[in-house]
Amino acid sequence: PSVPIVAIVTEKKGVVFAPYNPVWKKQRKFSHSTLRHFGLGKHSLEPKIIEEFKYVKDEILKHGEEQFNPFPIIGNAVSNVICSMAFGRRFDYDDAEFKNMLNLISRVLEVSLNSQVLLVNICPWLYYLPFGPFREFRQSVLDITAFLKNIIRQHRESLDVQYPRDFIDMYLLHSDEEKKINGESSFNEDYLFFIIGDLFIAGTDTTSNTLLWSLLYMSLHPVT
């Protein structure tokens, strides 16, 4: 079933929340095969995960025996593995834009699940109210949009047909090829943005929480 707040934010595009139709099937098939090409679900992704774990270990060791919150470290690591496939690069944990985007994603999820914003699912027009959590939610979505669209723009400007670097490059090349053959294509930068958003918001939150629960369990039961 369609969830109003999700439908408004995603414009019914992407691969996670889009309606089942021929366009969705094409987008999902391409996304799945391309992500597998870059290692998703394969052993070839393992070196990237191991490489990122080195940064995680360094961050944890900085705290010594002091208590610390592992959430931002794990969130950074998971996001960087996704970045390596989608953007062809990782971000330093101290990168201001990267930290801001992760904070925005976390805040969007928190506000959408634990505030009056939930009422949008009953009265969709509430989404456009210019105050309170409604305004904060919209602004956070706009800021995330600006960050991701800037990444896509940078890829378009530096695109090399002979050497696609990552998911975004492959998507742009596929879009250009379809337009050249058919004159038009359902593959466009607008749809690409929502797919990248799906990868980050759905992938980062679920994987991070799974790892955090695993860390908690191992901390409470170190011998098991």
Predicted regions and their residues:
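Generic alpha-helical secondary structure signal
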Residues: P22-F30, K48-Y55, A77, N100, ...
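Cytochrome P450 substrate-recognition site 1
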Residues: P1-L45, N69, I74-V81, E97-L126
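Short helix-capping/linker segments at secondary-structure and domain boundaries
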Residues: S84-D94, E177-K179, M218-T224
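Hydrophobic alpha-helical cores of multi-pass transmembrane domains in eukaryotic membrane proteins
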Residues: I49-F53, I74-I82, I196, F200, ...
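Conserved cytochrome P450 catalytic core segment spanning the I/J/K helices
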Residues: R36-L40, E65, S115, S140-L211
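Cytochrome P450 catalytic-core helices
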Residues: T206-T224
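Cytochrome P450
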Residues: G39-E51, L61-S84, D92-N100, W125-F147, ...
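Juxtamembrane membrane-interface segments of multi-pass membrane proteins
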Residues: L45, I49, I151, H155-R156, ...
